[in-house]
Design a protein with these regions (language model features):
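Ligand-binding clefts of soluble mixed alpha/beta catalytic domains
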Residues: 1-515
């Protein structure tokens, strides 16, 4: 009886499924790119995607826009399941007017973000956009503003993840920057506020799309990209792995993943990772891999600010966030980028009930005019703020050097870290022994007949008196000195002890971190 209406509906649905049409889909494939719908189906469990607002269109007539109406209006979105966990998802569709954002497209995105917050589910955005739709003028800009506001509303409530698999320019770049994690696909994803043409016009500077805002640029230099994927398939794998470590929302804890790694496992070779000479570099990741479940560590921001390591792991099946000095780069010294990288990660962990394990081997903050003039004081203070603010369980282990302000900043007892351990190899002091002797004994060394022998003697005396873990243990700065072989079981026991931790901050609207 209603066959005509059903036929009309099926025709419209088929048209919506084809987005910008077969010709544009073919062009997308020729560029080596999947379509928005293909990307969503690749990420979600098979058959789980439920589309919302599939028949949306714009309502503009200027510039012959009435002839350029496509169902979906450049955004495909809805909800589905990833490894049996519900998520909300939207993807910019480059086959429809270059994936430009319209007023209706923005309404679709913010509707999905509202659903995600109300239902306590992660929200995932896939970027492939030419930016604002110029034909809609201020309405398109209003749309971006609404999205930014919703990014703020969702922040710290549900995880927000962005996949950059195409261009993002102008206003389109700020929403990804406000999300928790950004995955960029190498040679496909680009992000910049102003493109190469504008840069050339204004500054006379010749720069390619990749150099200005490609995945490697943002993965290694700006820090905008947390992960750089080789292709779209690896990008989706990053998202799936990331979701496996984090909870659905801020009221839940991450899922416990059972495994066969003995929580009491010892590693008597762990101490051998550290060189006898404390000035020689070593790879802190070897220590991390040794102590976590099944030696699996999911590193975040691997290519950026490599003098500090952050990422996720599990201890006895429970997710933890790891923050660690990396002596292989800048001797593990803290600088502007590493301070920003670590403080951002710590705050994410605190938002989503993820305990923080800190491994320390740092000689201090990076010196020099470049660091001072670019604000190491301001940026370095973020790390102090992030640790102090975090109320999740916090465990710190000093494995090597811990000098000066950097010692305090790296999860010290003074910042209300719950458990502080030190290895016998730890050196906790205001300064390294060599630098301290140079300052305190300058006159003696200058007048000595054998300054080298005297300096060695003074350095040894300073180390014995001050730069060792036992002085710190004697005054409670660290809770105890532990056998490195027992690091894994000691951390797991501490996590179990802290599993019911309740820590409340003083009432306030919000703190004022020195951004």
């Amino acid at each position: 009886m209603h066959s005509d209406k059903i036929d009309e509906f099926l025709k419209k649905r088929k048209t919506a499924d084809q987005a910008g049409g077969q010709d544009r889909i073919a062009k997308q494939h020729e560029k080596g790119k999947l379509t928005a719908r293909e990307r969503i189906n690749l990420l979600l469990d098979e058959g789980s995607f439920v589309e919302i607002d599939a028949l949306t269109t714009h309502h503009y007539h200027q510039y012959d826009m009435q002839k350029k109406k496509f169902f979906g209006d450049g955004i495909i979105g809805g909800y589905g399941v990833i490894n049996s966990r519900q998520v909300y998802i939207f993807a910019y569709d480059f086959t429809v007017l270059g994936g430009t954002l319209s007023k209706m497209g923005a309404k679709k995105i913010t509707k999905l973000m509202d659903h995600a917050v109300r239902n306590g589910c992660p929200i995932i955005g896939i970027m492939d956009s030419g930016g604002a739709r110029i034909q809609e003028g201020i309405q398109s800009l209003d749309g971006f503003g609404d999205i930014f506001y919703h990014n703020q509303l969702a922040s710290g409530v549900v995880p927000q993840i962005t996949a950059s698999i195409g261009p993002s320019a102008g206003g389109a770049v700020y929403s990804p920057a406000m999300t928790d994690f950004v995955i960029m696909v190498d040679k496909l994803g680009t992000m910049f506020v102003t493109g190469p043409d504008v840069v050339k016009t204004v500054l006379g500077e010749e720069v390619s799309f990749e150099e200005l805002g490609g995945a490697m640029t943002h993965g290694t230099k700006s820090g905008v990209a947390h992960f750089v994927a080789k292709n779209e398939y690896e990008c989706m794998d990053y998202i799936k792995t990331l979701l496996s470590y984090i909870p659905q929302n801020n009221t839940e804890e991450p899922s416990i993943v059972s495994n066969d790694d003995d929580p009491n496992r010892l590693d008597h070779n762990l101490i051998n990772i550290l060189p006898e000479d404390s000035l020689k570099p070593y790879d802190m990741k070897e220590i991390i891999h040794s102590i976590v479940d099944n030696h699996n560590f999911f590193e975040v921001h691997e290519l950026f600010a490599q003098n500090i390591i952050v990422g996720f792991a599990r201890m006895n099946g429970k997710t933890i966030g790891v923050v660690a000095s990396q002596p292989l780069f800048l001797a593990g010294a803290l600088d502007i980028d590493s301070s920003n990288k670590a403080s951002r990660f710590i705050r994410f962990c605190d938002c989503y009930n993820i305990p923080i394990l800190t491994l320390v081997d740092t000689p201090g903050y990076m010196p020099g005019t470049n660091q001072e003039h670019n604000g190491i004081i301001r940026h370095g203070s973020k790390l102090l703020y992030a640790y102090s603010e975090a109320t999740v369980p916090k465990i710190t282990i000093v494995v090597g050097k811990a000098y000066g302000g950097a010692y305090i900043a790296m999860g010290s007892k003074n910042l209300r870290t719950d458990v502080n351990y030190a290895w016998p190899t730890a050196r906790i002091a205001v300064l390294g022994s060599d630098a301290a002797v140079n300052i305190m004994n300058r006159r003696e060394l200058a007048s000595s007949k054998d300054p080298e022998a005297l300096k060695k003697q003074l350095v040894d005396e300073f180390t014995e008196k001050f730069a060792n873990p036992y002085v710190a243990a004697s005054n409670g700065t660290v809770d105890t000195v532990i056998d490195p072989a027992e690091t894994r079981p000691m951390v797991i026991k501490a996590l179990e002890m802290l599993s019911n931790k309740r820590d409340r901050q003083l009432p306030r609207k919000h703190g004022n971190m020195n951004l």
